[in-house]
Regions:
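Acidic (Asp/Glu-rich) sequence patches and key acidic residues
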Residues: 1-97, 108-115, 129-156
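A common structural junction motif
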Residues: 117-124
Length: 156
């Protein structure tokens, strides 16, 4: 089973750390293993760079975005996509400071959740600590380029 912890990173931090996802992952990984003062220090750093997740907004967005997806259900404020034909299933839970995604089988169901979250906000980063995999759900360079082109329009 794959398990992803998904965090909403402050936009200024996300732009500064584009291409340096490894540093963010190392901070979160170190926090998971740390004790004592190191745990406190890494916890403060993490609290500074992440933003609270708006549970109600994301619930609504997922319901609208995934409503037509085969095998999608929402039960007890948890979201599931089960696709036996594709040997794929995933579940998503939204917490105050992060989102947790579990999946088994092929990656089709988890990809649906990632796409829905990417569509909601461009500053999510997903981390699978057991497999040491991580990455932005949306390429931030496209976000940065869009912002630059918007600011250039103001000068025209």
């Amino acid at each position: 089973m794959r398990e992803y912890h998904i965090y909403k990173i402050r936009e200024d931090v996300a732009l500064d750390y584009y291409g340096m996802e490894t540093k963010l992952f190392q901070l979160f990984q170190e926090n998971r293993e740390a004790k004592g003062r190191l745990k406190e220090a890494t916890e403060k750093q993490i609290q500074y760079i992440i933003q609270q997740v708006n549970k109600v907004e994301i619930q609504d967005h997922l319901n609208k975005y995934l409503r037509e997806t085969e095998g999608y259900i929402m039960r007890d404020n948890k979201h599931y996509i089960m696709s036996p034909k594709r040997n794929s299933q995933a579940g998503l839970c939204i917490y105050k400071m992060h989102i947790k995604l579990f999946s088994e089988g092929s990656q089709d169901s988890e990809a649906c959740f990632f796409e829905a979250l990417r569509n909601y906000d461009g500053t999510f980063i997903a981390m699978d600590f057991s497999r040491e995999q991580y990455g932005w759900l949306k390429p931030l360079k496209s976000l940065e380029i869009a912002e630059l082109s918007e600011s250039n329009k103001a000068f025209k």
